[in-house]
């Protein structure tokens, strides 16, 4: 029962992706689709002037992007949850 539900859901997702791909005329379709699904801009990291999640940083220099903070322990940018 679980396997058939999973296969049905996977089939619907595949149908959606194929339908969207057939209508898309851009060559950067996979990047565009992933960007829309995850609502993040990780593919254009070179364009921004700040460091994103997982990038190395120096604590106290404020190099990380908004909503990120430099970890004193690990020395990389992580998501700041406001604590």
From Swiss-Prot:
Keywords: Amidation, Disulfide bond, Ion channel impairing toxin, Knottin, Neurotoxin, Presynaptic neurotoxin, Secreted, Signal, Toxin, Voltage-gated sodium channel impairing toxin. GO terms for cellular component: extracellular region; host cell presynaptic membrane. It is found in: Secreted. InterPro entries: Huwentoxin-1 (IPR011696), Huwentoxin_CS1 (IPR013140). The keyword Protease does not apply. PROSITE patterns: HWTX_1. The keyword Glycosyltransferase does not apply. Residues 22-48 form a propeptide. Expressed by the venom gland. Residues 1-21 form the signal peptide. The modification Leucine amide is found at residue 81. Disulfide bonds join 50-65, 57-70, 64-77. GO terms for molecular function: ion channel inhibitor activity; sodium channel regulator activity; toxin activity. Monomer. The presence of a 'disulfide through disulfide knot' structurally defines this protein as a knottin. Lethal neurotoxin. Selectively blocks tetrodotoxin-sensitive voltage-gated sodium channels (Nav). Does not affect tetrodotoxin-resistant voltage-gated sodium channels or calcium channels. Belongs to the neurotoxin 10 (Hwtx-1) family. 15 (Hntx-3) subfamily. This is Mu-theraphotoxin-Hhn2j 2. It comes from Cyriopagopus hainanus.
């Amino acid at each position: 029962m679980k396997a058939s539900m999973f296969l049905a859901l996977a089939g619907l997702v595949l149908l959606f992706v194929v339908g969207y791909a057939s209508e898309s005329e851009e060559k950067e379709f996979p990047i565009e689709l992933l960007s829309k699904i995850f609502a993040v801009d990780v593919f254009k990291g070179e364009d921004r002037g700040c460091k994103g999640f997982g990038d190395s940083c120096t604590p106290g220099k404020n190099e990380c992007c908004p909503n990120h903070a430099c970890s004193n322990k690990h020395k990389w940018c992580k998501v700041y949850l406001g604590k």
